[in-house]
Amino acid sequence: MTDTTPDLILQTAAGFMMSKHLFAANDLGLFEKLADRPLTLDELANDLSIPSRTARITADAMVALGFLEKQDDRYRNSSVSQTFLSGKTPADLRPFLRFWNHISYPQWQHLEEALRTNRGVSGDVELDPDQQRIFSEGVAAIQAGPAHAMPEKYDFTRHRKVLDLGGGVGEYLVPILDRFPQLEGTLFELPPVTEVARDALAANPVGPRINIVAGDLFEDALPEDHDALILANVVHYFDHARNRELLRRIRERVLAGARVLIVDFWTNPQHTEPLFAALVAGEFLTSVGGDVYSEEEAKGWFRETGWEYLQTIPLEGPISLVVGEAI
């Protein structure tokens, strides 16, 4: 008789139940309602405006997963929920969960098709303004950690102007310019994203030092006269050939000595670790036909496009910074 069990299969297959329970609890505002004090089931149901029976289902599922604690007849946030999902701290991952629930999760229904056809099946669907805001705010939320780590781990004192290509709503530029007051920044993004970025940066103290330019990385002229160029969460959108083309385009716009700073979910050479990076390859495939890459592959792009690899700097979790210098 074998000791092998199907536990791994069952636990993995149940992953969609765990994520949808978490997404629903977040959208209902469960963790916000428990941010200030523990609540009974009836109090929770009343505050959420849902029946007591369904309030019990969602709350007990969150207890089972470790997001809530239950003592006697009262529910309270666990430390992780209070920190990241209650809205009471700057480390707010609620927008990220909304992004995965409303934008990413529906796309994953097409994973098998994407695997069979070797192309994204959702990337051509245009986001409406509300979806674009959910997308942009969600990406900014999950990138907040590595974005704030970057100016602490990479020294920008040698630079004067930073160009963030595909810069979202400024999640990387803002902490960099805040930490290094000598810098000026340019955010280059697609037109729908720049509208969200303008709103996000309007009241930010570093906003006046950021020039927002709308354009396409491959179709429009890239801004010139920058000596640091950021590609954060960009290369996973494209295949090898397209990434080499992008790096060549950037190299043509800068002088020798300028640096390109590529932030992404880099994997080991086998593309099997870290776990999150290996899994998120499916996210990029289904959405835009993209992929995750290894540090070695980035070095190969550099050799072929006029850059010299300098170093890799871990930022946070599975996200690292790969640095190249124009030669």
Name each region found by the language model.
Residues 6-28, 32-38, 46-47, 53-160:
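Conserved Class I S-adenosyl-L-methionine-dependent methyltransferase catalytic core
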Residues 1-64, 69-70, 156, 161, ...:
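Alpha-helical subdomain
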